[in-house]
């Protein structure tokens, strides 16, 4: 778990939902420095690779960008192989002294697979097609799990889960960015 430090940049909630031929990653736009909101419209969900992978990141911003860049390099090395690229990144993350100190997590998805890349170098797949990370991750995860068996679309579930997390978590706001892909 990331420890709270008043001089560290925190925040964010990222959620992913895979349902009915769609995969969605949604995230809020808040960046906090200690207990102060520094920015409300940061973009923490984006397309990477050749646009066929979506990623959302939580944790300290510089660390998250470092990992995102490393994942993009692995995707260039292993095109159209998100699982392989993620495992190779995790190997680096676990063995490189510099990378081991990074405080960030990512959710990544392509048409075939959704993965969480953790700060300990784990690569995890969701059990029920939903996963969430970040300061409001537990709230978003609970909301998404409650909604996954309804007739709502993947995007509707992700947006509702993010709004619930933003209502509860002080490090999450309602400025929600959503990226989606067709899924197999």
From Swiss-Prot:
Compartment(s): Cytoplasm
Lineage: superkingdom: Bacteria
Activity control: Allosterically activated by HslU binding.
This protein's GO CC annotations: HslUV protease complex; proteasome core complex
Residues that, per the record, bind Na(+): 166, 169, 172
Swiss-Prot/TrEMBL keywords: Allosteric enzyme, Cytoplasm, Hydrolase, Metal-binding, Protease, Sodium, Threonine protease
Primary enzyme class: hydrolase
Purpose: Protease subunit of a proteasome-like degradation complex believed to be a general protein degrading machinery.
Protein name (Swiss-Prot/TrEMBL): ATP-dependent protease subunit HslV
